[in-house]
Amino acid sequence: DKPIVIYGMMKVAENATLNIMPGTTLYFHSDAGIEVNGSLNAIGTAEENIVLRGDRTDHMFDYLPYDMVSGQWQGLRFTKSSYNNVMKYVDLHGSFDGIVCDSSNVNIDKLELSSCTVHNCQGYGLKIVNSKVNISNSQITNTLNNCVGVFGGDVTLNHCTIAQFYPFDSKRGPALAYTNILDNEAIPLLRMDCINSIVTGYANDQIDGRNIGDETTLFNFRFINSILRTPQTEDEEHIFNTWFENVEDTAAIDGDRHFKLVNINKQRYDFHLSDKSSAIDSANVEFSLPLDRDGNKRDDRPDIGCFEFFKESNEE
């Protein structure tokens, strides 16, 4: 079969639905992306992920294919009129912004992102503005701006790996940012729950939470059973059974503390857990999901992050 190459913006009309089948790979030219005014159903399987990537198949250097370089295409945008979007088992990488959710009615589900990868973006991984979004079992990694940026709305992150090891610019943003203001406009943060998730990266502080300070504008957030690379704080109202990384731990800085491979020199990454990670067996069972990012069954003592650790497979 011939590859599907997209030039220019693919626009999904309001009241229309774009369905992308399991195993589909879409190649986007530098000016191409998807603007969703209606709905998107991109539902792959563990065996047949949907892949959204740039169209260049050559190399920048001998060791570096363009498929591993950020900023190759325009990513996805869900506009104000877009609701009830579902993405499962999707691998999106190499774009500018990965996924942008424009401001919308927070009482209606805008996006369910489940068992997905958003990686190596020359902008945001996920930029969520005043929207209702549920993110689970997903890897959001290596972005110039925030891996996940939440500007108001209702957002849940469960069993996610959010790691900021972006190699192409030292001015990379924190892995996770959340606030109740954008462009000097107050936007209530109804909820930002980060559960059973890893938030880490190179810098000592990978979390940026900013409250406008206006008591009339909601700023609701919780961290539950997560591992955070940020200065330790005592906040019994918002932080529950959560571990703070030691910023002096060079293994964490190098990614070796948690992940199988973080090689900035060759731009090779594998965010499956290493056998040294404190994420193993540390998730909250009450919030745990039965399967991980790869579709593997979690055990009775599930792990924090999107990947369950399996000793046998990791030793092969």
Model-derived regions: residue spans:
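Carboxylate-dense, calcium-coordinating segments in secreted/extracellular and ER-lumen proteins
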Residues: 299-306
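Beta-strand/loop edge motif enriched in small/polar residues
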Residues: 1-269, 276-293, 307-316
